């Protein structure tokens, strides 16, 4: 009898190792032991040939700077989290993700993780402090508020109730929240198993990950929600968290968002394109700290003008103003000349000022051609 029990245990262990793809995972770790962080993530996504789709306009909604809490639904599990990291780092190399227990076991992920250890109160306090610290250093943090993968329900595949923790981080650090909807699914067997035996279905997720091979998911990114939109409210944090959950799913369906959003500022222009265009401009002089002064005559569809417009919007929003457009460019730019201060050390536009020949402008367009006439 004891011999039969030993044989049975061995068979069960062998089955579980096969089910959890133990040998494949261990072999992958050995083959890529020299990689970590985003390099390791690239290899994981490549191993599964797991890809994602996103529109150019959605990609531009990712803020290129500033404190940012990114929240998303979690339809698949590990792979949708890695794909989201891969996406966000294209704009925000400083992005990190709040880790689940499975990812925390892999040292290769450490550079991009902000793990939470529930085993120790002191450790947990330190981990929460690390998340706040990363945001206070103007970083970006991905959080899956559901804390687990989506399940099948009466309205389809949906996250469970969202934890309010992400709101606390955003409020304490005055961070904007970027909502992202992920369109993806696990197998019907997984959802059926979730109904019958939820703990077992969680273990089954490893097998589900391998069934995602050659799959493609789609990201929909909404405009960011400024912290003022959710901090000054009489609604409880628990209710606000569920409102963000609804916001995400409305985003996925292209419906009107729950929260008032703010159009993200355009992404920076390609540095080499700006430099090439500046070389065609008249060089007026240089400053003592290695900055060059160029005269730029307006031309449509130029990297210089787009970058000036982006920097204007960035500067004015910082003091509570701005056009609330992706770039601050108006009709006066077409008829004005532009002084551009180029920082050769930092490879960026350090400043810009537009001006015109007033007498000439008055003779051609009258008083309406003068910008200051629109202010008084």
What are these regions (language model features)?
Residues 89, 95-124, 128-135:
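Conserved nucleotide-cofactor-binding alpha/beta core module
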Residues 290-376:
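A conserved beta-strand-loop-helix scaffold within acyl/acetyltransferase catalytic domains
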Residues 30, 45-50, 117-122, 155-156:
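Short, flexible loop segments at the rims of nucleotide/cofactor-binding pockets, characterized by
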Residues 262-299:
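Conserved N-terminal entry element of GNAT/NAT acetyltransferase domains
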Residues 55, 65, 69-71, 77-84, ...:
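Short acidic (Asp/Glu) patches
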Residues 1-74, 81-83, 90-92, 110-111, ...:
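Membrane-anchoring hydrophobic helices of lipid-metabolizing enzymes
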Residues 69-71, 113-115, 142-144:
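Structural motif
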Residues 1, 94, 125-273:
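Non-catalytic C-terminal accessory region of glycerolipid acyltransferases
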């Amino acid at each position: 009898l004891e011999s039969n029990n030993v044989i049975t245990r061995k068979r069960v262990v062998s089955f579980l190792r096969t089910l959890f793809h133990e040998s494949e995972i261990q072999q992958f770790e050995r083959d890529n032991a020299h990689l970590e962080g985003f390099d390791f993530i690239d290899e994981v996504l490549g191993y599964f040939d797991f890809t994602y789709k996103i529109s150019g306009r959605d990609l531009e909604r990712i803020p290129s700077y500033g404190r940012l809490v990114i929240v998303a639904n979690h339809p698949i599990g590990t792979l949708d989290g890695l794909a989201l990291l891969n996406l966000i780092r294209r704009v925000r190399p400083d992005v990190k993700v709040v880790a689940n227990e499975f990812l925390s076991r892999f040292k290769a992920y450490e550079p991009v993780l902000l793990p939470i250890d529930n085993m120790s109160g002191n450790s947990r306090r330190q981990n929460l402090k690390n998340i706040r610290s990363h945001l206070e250093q103007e970083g970006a943090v991905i959080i899956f508020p559901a804390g687990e993968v989506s399940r099948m329900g009466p309205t389809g595949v949906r996250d469970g109730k969202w934890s309010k923790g992400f709101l606390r981080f955003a409020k304490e650090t005055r961070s904007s929240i970027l909502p992202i909807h992920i369109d993806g699914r696990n197998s019907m067997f997984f959802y059926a198993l979730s109904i019958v035996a939820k703990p077992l279905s969680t273990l089954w997720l490893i097998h589900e990950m391998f069934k995602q091979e050659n799959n493609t998911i789609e990201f929909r990114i909404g405009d960011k929600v400024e912290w003022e939109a959710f901090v000054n409210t009489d609604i409880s944090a628990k209710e606000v968290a569920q409102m963000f959950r609804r916001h995400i799913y409305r985003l996925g369906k292209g419906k009107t968002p729950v929260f008032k959003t703010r159009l993200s500022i355009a992404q920076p222009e390609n540095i080499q394109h700006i430099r090439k265009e500046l070389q065609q401009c008249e060089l007026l002089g240089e400053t003592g700290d290695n900055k060059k002064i160029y005269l730029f005559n307006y031309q449509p569809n130029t990297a210089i003008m787009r970058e000036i417009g982006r920097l204007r919007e960035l500067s004015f929003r910082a003091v509570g103003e701005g056009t609330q457009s992706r770039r601050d460019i108006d009709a006066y730019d077409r008829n004005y000349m532009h002084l551009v201060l180029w920082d050769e050390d930092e490879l960026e536009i350090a400043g810009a000022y537009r001006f015109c020949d007033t007498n000439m402008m008055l003779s051609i367009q009258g008083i309406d051609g003068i910008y200051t006439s629109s202010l008084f």
